[in-house]
Amino acid sequence: MLGKDMKMEEQNAEYVQEFLDNEIVRLGELIEEYKANVKVMGEDFNMDNPNGGMYSGMELTQIHHEMEKQFIYSEEAARDAYFYKKLRKAPYFARVDFKSDRATREKTIYIGLRTLQKHDTFEMLVCDWRAPIASLFYEDFPDKAFFKAPSGEIRGDLLLKRQYKFENGKLKYYVDSDLKIDDDILRDVLSSSSSEHLKVIVNSIQREQNKVIRYSDNENLLVIGPAGSGKTSVGFHRLAYLLYQNRTELSSAEIIMFSNNDIFSSYVADIIPELGEMPINYSSFYNIFKAEIPTISTGDYYSLAESIINGDSRRSKSAGIKLSKDFVAYLESDTDVCEPEFQDITLFGNVIFSKEALLERFLSDTENSQKSRGARLAAYTQGVIDEYFINNREEIYLHIDADSEIDEDTAKLFKAKRRQIKESAAEMIKSAILVDPIAVYFKLLEKYAEENNCPELLDTMATLEKGYLEFEDAIGVVYVKSVLGMAAVLSGVKHILIDEAQDLSYIQHKLILRMFPRARVTLLADTNQAIISELNTTSKEELAEIYNANILNLNKSYRSTKEINSYALKLLPEEKRYEIFERTGEDVKEISGNIEDFKNVVKEMAENSPSTCIITRNLKETIEVFNELKTEIDGLRICDNKSFELSHNPIVMPLALTKGLEFDNVIVYDKDGAFSGDENKKYLYMAATRALHRLTIFNCKSELKSEN
């Protein structure tokens, strides 16, 4: 859309592009200068250099530190240059004209991914989307506009809200909007193809999403939203916003994102750097297992999900108990099932403190962890030893040197003996309380199973003999280790983002709180997408209670076309349905046929768009489909929870691994009604909402066989 101001807008775009070009050149020269400096200093630092011996050790240390600084400056300049090159494609995406009630003239603010400011004149060319004044673009104001600045609320008149479309650095058009981000531009954004990585959405953030992003960093936040509502993107944009707002208090290294799906972690890994920040940390509970119980192999969340999806009701019941709130309380209340084996503290054949008395005192102290109780017992024991030495001084002197009078040397030996007894007692107590958390966990499990008549809880004990722990047992072991005070406490982590929070069990959430006691938490959840709802904390009220979190709702889905969204909504109970953004596309296809028909459908869809995913109910079916199609479909890949990177090649995946991902085209492989029936509607809903543009449900009657 061309307007009367198009010439002026083109001139402004060229002005900003010129600034970027100059900055890229300047940064390139700086990088070369830093490299040259490092080279010169490196020659001086080389001791083989004839002049190397001229420097003292302190001077060489200073040279080394200066070289490190030059390396850091060079890396920072390189990052800035890289980012400026990206900004050349679209230096900004919006403009607002605002007249504050305090000002006499209006102010024009261009908004982009990053602040662009001239070094000499301090002229602000582009304002960072995270700046307080930029919030004017994302909000709707029926009356006076306002934004929250550090100095307080600034009120005034919003005179213009304008959006821009750039293509390869050239301004194509702009659109003026009175109230909200223009739907045509939003449709344009949503109509684009899927990507191997989560996309930056700063140019299309909606009002309710903006509220989540800019929410207070002093409180825990639970974000509830349907599939396609932008929860994950909003969560990461919130992290970028918090980093921008708290430069001196929060760094990327102090943030961690938790997910049950390692493939999803790779999908989102680039978004924080794309938003101009250093990468954050990513983890899963499987990584925690490797750190806390490294001597034993463990299952992951996906292996448990596969068992439940495949109908293993016995394991479902067992895991449901092990991951529950009641079992957590049981683990916390009785970790003394493996009593410490204390030894008598003796001196010259006399018992100072008996092992029975040590155990009795230890068991009578029920506050805090076993490690803390052991420390208190050790401190108490030191006092008992001191008192014994004072009360039995003469007898001890006789044992030390019966033939000599008490002199200075004897007194020194007396003190040395007391120190020796105290040190050995402290070491004995420390060793005694270092119980095996695996042994403690399984003793507790046996006790609980007997008390509650749940023999199925012990089914997984057989795997321990093979050096393997199932996921639900590994979580329990690490939790017991934490209760005992033996697990890591990562106080340096200040913020945690938990994606698909509804897929984490009660015990997982509680373990996060124990291991990261200083961290604020942002949780992203959709209770309609609990992959194994029998095991998980699916109530948003319960999630909020665990973290003492406030709840914000995202009520509209943007990902899929109107046709796909309408199909998915019919799979949900009426009370759980949500708003959709209307973007029209192709009708959803429901096809029945044999294996040859299935091959033809996949071929046709993959030829039209490589971003095609065939979603199966489980891993067994994934392998069957892949083996049947691998010679028919060019570049077909299989995702089976091993090392995997997403690409634009067609792919076959089991349902559990598709959580959080999106594809242009989705074919749901409904083998013999695997996704049919009321009990399977939630699985079909999860699969259907992975599709952006085209969705096909294929009911295949032919029997496929997996190859080993």
Model regions and ranges:
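Extended, charged low-complexity regulatory segments
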Residues: 1-202, 206, 210-214, 708
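A structural signal for short, well-ordered beta-strand segments and their strand-loop junctions
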Residues: 95-97, 163, 222, 234, ...
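Conserved phosphate/pyrophosphate-binding and hydrolysis machinery centered on Walker-type P-loop NTPases
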Residues: 191, 195, 367, 371-374, ...
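Conserved helicase motor core of SF1/SF2 NTP-dependent helicases
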Residues: 248, 262, 266, 270, ...
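Alpha-helical nucleic-acid-binding subdomain
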Residues: 243-497, 503-511, 519, 528, ...
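Short, conserved glycine- and acidic-residue-centered signature motifs
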Residues: 235, 470, 680
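P-loop NTPase Walker
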Residues: 2-34, 188-304, 686-689, 708
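Short hydrophobic beta-strand that contains or immediately precedes a catalytic carboxylate
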Residues: 205, 497-498
